[in-house]
Swiss-Prot record, chain A:
PANTHER family: VERY-LONG-CHAIN (3R)-3-HYDROXYACYL-COA DEHYDRATASE, VERY-LONG-CHAIN (3R)-3-HYDROXYACYL-COA DEHYDRATASE 2. Residues 1-11 have a biased composition (Low complexity). One of its GO terms (cellular component) is endoplasmic reticulum membrane. It comes from the Eukaryota. Residues 198-214 are annotated as: May be involved in interaction with TECR. Residues 61-79, 126-130, 188-217 are lumenal. One of its GO terms (biological process) is very long-chain fatty acid biosynthetic process. This is Very-long-chain (3R)-3-hydroxyacyl-CoA dehydratase 2. The modification N-acetylalanine is found at A2. Residues 2-41, 98-107, 147-169, 236-254 are cytoplasmic. The active site is at Y176, E183.
Length: 254, 308
């Protein structure tokens, strides 16, 4: 879901043409854009994020070449992954203060779900860090984010290469299911360790008269993918048809 | 004579939906809505939004056709507000749920706690007291809905009832589960804490009721007039000097009292969520008071004296 939501719901981080987001029609209307200082900040933000995820991508490749296998590559990119994915929390702020026209709620869900997977699952349950499923979602996220942040960078500069737009609205077809599979398998792998350690769980009796079963909570999270993922996926397919055919028509008249 | 004509177009498609030929100049929007329903019975008046501009504000039922800036043929744009349900129905359902649900947990109905606890009773006084307070609170709300409140809108969208009931019923079940649990832990400071909390709760319930009565008396039956509320002889209403929506202030106070009484985290969370929502409503109400009344008392804050 974190992978899916990131592509589907995010329409922000500035930029003009051809943006797609949950419920937003692609428009060629000239919107009153952000001021020059804001645009500069957003460009810097998106460039830094693009660079960050490139660092993660390069880190993965180098680690693979050095180790000779694709297992346990998580450890080589753990720090930049945590840093740049957590940094995406700023995007919620961008929406809240209005410099980016996306919905705060939608952006929050997408970023929080990523941050949840990084910290509350992968970081917290050390035993899953060597699972192959982690590599699955890390690769999906890395490719998605490199494309997404460069898309925003170019949009802000009003020079969006068709290739980037195409990539953003096409690669998700594979990256989405890949990311979702990685996420679900990782959560599933974490379950027995959560149960064993009673991780983040509190039981009765206690003086706050409250209980929380993290194991049950994780299962609920997994179940929530069932209604959410198809909706996000088919929304993106719909957006793709609208945006890529729209561009085709424009090209015809050039 | 030149009797006005009214054409109604769909606000989104601009399709001509209805043409009303001889309309009385003194006709109100409400009457036009009734005429429109005759040709389109699936759109009963409560779900019609008629406006002069497709993107403009909805016209009010009381607006008179002649007084609107229209020519001899008035063009009105129609938007379907979706299935509507009356406010009274929604309130009654939202409040009856928690009343009933809490009692299921209080009486430890089977399948909630272990079998050996079925239909047993808690040995803690505070648990019985909490049940009385919670039940009183919702009975009060039901009675106020039936006999006290004067609603300015008749209806709200149907989907609201599902959203609202999930919220009220869900939280009621969640807090009731812990308070009535066999492993419930009574408050750390014992009877002192419970007495203090009960006092807060009772005072705030009385306060909340006083405000509801004062607001009711502000508006005559059947009317939709709005006036600035002022303190009355009832000391509980003196909070009007400091806040625009003291009913919300007292409501938050009641739940804080209940949270202290039960020392139950879910109750505290429910209070927090409720406080957040009521603050949003209070700020909105405060803003519309300021917009509508030039002479609105400047000292007043929306919900918390001097602060918020």
């Amino acid at each position: 879901m974190a992978a899916a939501a990131a592509i589907a719901a995010s329409k922000g981080n500035g930029g003009g043409g051809g943006r797609a987001g949950a419920g937003e029609a692609s428009s060629s209307r000239r919107k009153k854009g952000p001021g020059p200082l804001t645009t500069a900040y957003l460009v810097i933000y998106n460039v830094v994020m693009t660079a960050g995820w490139l660092v993660i991508a390069v880190g993965l490749v180098r680690a693979y070449l050095a180790k000779g296998s694709y297992h346990s590559l998580y450890y080589s990119i753990e720090k930049p992954l945590k840093f740049f994915q957590t940094g995406a929390l700023l995007e919620i702020l961008h929406c809240a203060i209005g410099i980016v026209p996306s919905s705060v709620v939608l952006t929050s869900i997408q970023v929080m779900s990523r941050v949840f997977l990084i910290w509350a699952v992968t970081h917290s349950v050390k035993e899953v860090q060597s699972e192959d499923s982690v590599l699955l979602f890390v690769i999906a996220w890395t490719i998605t984010e490199i494309i997404r942040y460069s898309f925003y960078t170019f949009s802000l500069l009003n020079h969006l290469p068709y290739l980037i737009k195409w990539a953003r609205y096409t690669l998700f077809i594979v990256l989405y299911p890949m990311g979702v599979s990685g996420e679900l398998l990782t959560i599933y792998a974490a379950l027995p360790f959560v149960r064993q350690a009673g991780l983040y769980s509190i039981s009765l009796p206690n003086k706050y008269n409250f209980s929380f079963d993290y194991y049950a909570f994780l299962i609920l999270i997994m179940i929530s993918y069932i209604p959410l993922f198809p909706q996000l996926y088919f929304h993106m397919i719909h957006q793709r048809r609208k945006i890529l055919s729209h561009t085709e028509e424009h090209k015809k008249f050039e | 004579g030149r009797q006005p004509r009214v054409e109604i177009l769909d606000a989104k498609t601009r399709e001509k939906l209805c043409f009303l030929d001889k309309v009385e100049p003194q006709a109100t929007i409400a009457e036009i809505k009734n005429l429109f329903t005759k040709t389109h019975p699936q759109w009963y008046p409560a779900r019609q939004s008629l406006r002069l501009d497709p993107k403009g504000k909805s016209l009010k039922d009381e607006d008179v056709l002649q007084k609107l800036p229209v020519g001899t043929t008035a063009t009105l744009y129609f938007r379907d507000l979706g299935a509507q349900i009356s406010w009274v129905t929604v309130f009654l359902t939202e409040y009856a749920g928690p009343l009933f649900i809490y009692l299921l947990f209080y009486f430890r109905v089977p399948f909630i706690y272990g079998r050996k606890y079925d239909f047993t009773s808690s040995r803690h006084t505070v648990v019985h007291l909490a049940c009385i307070c919670h039940s009183f609170h919702y009975i009060k709300r039901l009675l106020e809905t039936l006999f006290v409140h004067r609603f300015s809108h008749g209806t709200m969208p149907l989907r609201n009832i599902f959203k609202n009931c999930t919220y009220y019923w869900g939280f009621a079940a969640w807090m009731a589960y812990y308070i009535n649990h066999p492993l419930y832990t009574p408050p750390t400071y014992g009877a002192q804490q419970v007495k203090l909390a009960l006092a807060i709760f009772v005072i705030c319930q009385l306060g909340n009721f006083s405000i509801h009565m004062a607001l009711r008396d502000l508006r005559p039956a059947g009317s939709k007039t709005r006036k600035i509320p002022y303190p009355t002889r009832n000391p509980f209403t003196w909070l009007f000097l400091l806040v625009s929506c003291p009913n919300y202030t007292y409501e938050v106070g009641s739940w804080i009292g209940f949270a202290i009484m039960t020392q139950c985290l879910p109750v505290a969370l429910f209070s927090l969520v409720g406080f957040t929502q009521m603050t949003i409503w209070a700020k909105g109400k405060h803003r519309s008071y300021l917009k509508e009344f030039r002479d609105y008392p400047p000292l007043r804050m929306p919900i918390i004296p001097f602060l918020l």
